């Protein structure tokens, strides 16, 4: 989600592909801070507290420092702990974690000693899970933000092909099958199994999330999730924030995806993308989306990604929508990972607080290119603040 310890261009400064204990501690602390703003709902306390425990557990941090940095060690550890707690139900710790279909349990200071003791006692198990698995963040609430980006950039009424990079279980490819409530506006199928609510902040209203017809859809992921596999679904659940509402969203989205299977191609997104784009009908408009993926690509791979999109955009309209956590922005950074100029106030706000993302769009349209920063957004889809066109 949020990472420190990288150079301003995103490179690992040591070049060894791993993070130090201090870097992982900073990652965990930053995630904890992101879930503990002054206006945070009570249901966020557990997530913030869990990452606080991870940040303070020296033995766990040393184990995590053995992992490649692209495995997102702090996030992976939180999922491993959640997985074991949900599977084994150790008390009293399990009493703090929500169960599907039930209300959010209460939270108190007893969580901290219970969690510390559990991590210490099960350190080998937590470490083994982190060695074996990858973190899969399928926060379907982000679809509300992505849908607004599509509504703002796609050609009205024209059919589009949708490609989701790092799609995991492919839940983001179902976004036209969800209903949205953004501020006081609603859109999407009335009979949808899932309604996603997103607070609209600021003085500029985002567009209504009316989506064009999606005629083709494909996802790419290095480790796709088979939703027909119960063990895979259990891991996906462990990667969700430990909130009753997040589990309910995930359950509804998984049911929707199982009813409407999509094509998810295994492999590196940069290697696989050209073939996917070539598979669509000639001239078909394409929307390519990613949420927290491009930031973790090495700079040369990001440049290759842009080159692929630009090449495809010589004969069709291709729009790349990205939710970017603005990492690694650094103290002197002024551009997003997409290469879009950031408003000075947004940079200052990020450097002070660092708990929001940027939604940006780059469009390659028959040889011409344009780009625009659309909004700032909560990392897990809770709110969006649309920016005016002259915000920069």
Which residue stretches match the model-derived regions?
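A short SAM/SAH-binding and catalytic strip from SAM-dependent methyltransferases
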Residues: 286-299
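Class I S-adenosyl-L-methionine-dependent methyltransferase module
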Residues: 67-69, 87-90, 94-121, 132, ...
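A short N-terminal interaction module
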Residues: 12-125, 129-136, 140-146, 160
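Domain-level detector for long C-terminal conserved domains
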Residues: 231-234, 238-248, 266, 312-392
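Short amphipathic alpha-helix with an adjacent loop that forms part of the alpha/beta core around
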Residues: 273-281
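A short, conserved alpha-helix within the catalytic core of class I
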Residues: 297-307
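N-terminal amphipathic/basic-hydrophobic helices that include classical n-h-c signal peptides
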Residues: 1-17
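Conserved SAM/SAH-binding loop
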Residues: 267-271
């Amino acid at each position: 989600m949020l990472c420190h310890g990288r150079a301003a261009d995103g490179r690992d400064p040591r070049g060894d592909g791993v993070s130090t204990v201090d870097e992982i501690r900073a990652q965990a602390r930053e995630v904890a801070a992101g879930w503990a703003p002054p206006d945070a709902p009570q249901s966020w306390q557990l997530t913030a507290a869990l990452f606080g425990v991870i940040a303070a557990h020296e033995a766990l941090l040393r184990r995590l420092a053995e992992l490649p940095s692209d495995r997102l060690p702090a996030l992976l550890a939180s999922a491993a702990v959640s997985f074991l707690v949900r599977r084994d139900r150790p008390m009293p710790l399990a009493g703090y974690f929500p169960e599907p279909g039930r209300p959010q349990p209460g939270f108190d200071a007893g969580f901290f000693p219970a969690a510390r003791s559990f991590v210490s006692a099960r350190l080998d198990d937590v470490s083994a899970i982190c060695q074996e698995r990858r973190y899969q963040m399928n926060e379907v609430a982000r679809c509300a933000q992505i849908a607004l980006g599509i509504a703002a950039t796609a050609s009205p009424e024209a059919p589009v092909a949708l490609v989701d990079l790092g799609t995991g279980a492919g839940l983001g490819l179902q976004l036209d099958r969800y209903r949205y409530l953004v501020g006081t506006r609603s859109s999407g199928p009335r009979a949808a199994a899932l309604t996603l609510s997103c607070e609209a902040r600021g003085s500029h209203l985002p567009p209504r999330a009316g989506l064009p017809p999606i005629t083709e859809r494909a996802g790419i992921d290095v480790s796709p999730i088979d939703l027909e596999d119960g063990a895979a679904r259990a891991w996906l659940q462990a990667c969700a924030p430990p909130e009753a509402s997040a589990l309910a969203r995930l359950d509804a989205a998984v049911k929707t995806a199982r009813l409407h299977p999509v094509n998810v191609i295994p492999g590196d997104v940069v290697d696989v993308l050209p073939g996917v784009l070539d598979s669509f009908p000639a001239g078909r408009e394409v929307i390519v989306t990613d949420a927290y993926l491009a930031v973790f690509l090495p700079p040369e791979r990001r440049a290759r990604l842009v080159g692929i999109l630009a090449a495809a955009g010589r004969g069709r309209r291709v729009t790349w929508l990205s939710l970017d956590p603005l990492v690694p922005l650094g103290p002197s950074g002024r551009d997003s990972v997409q290469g879009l100029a950031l408003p000075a106030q947004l940079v200052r706000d990020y450097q002070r607080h660092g708990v929001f993302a940027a939604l940006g769009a780059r469009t390659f349209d028959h040889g011409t290119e344009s780009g625009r920063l659309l909004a700032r957004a909560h990392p897990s889809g809770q709110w969006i603040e649309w920016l005016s066109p002259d915000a920069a």
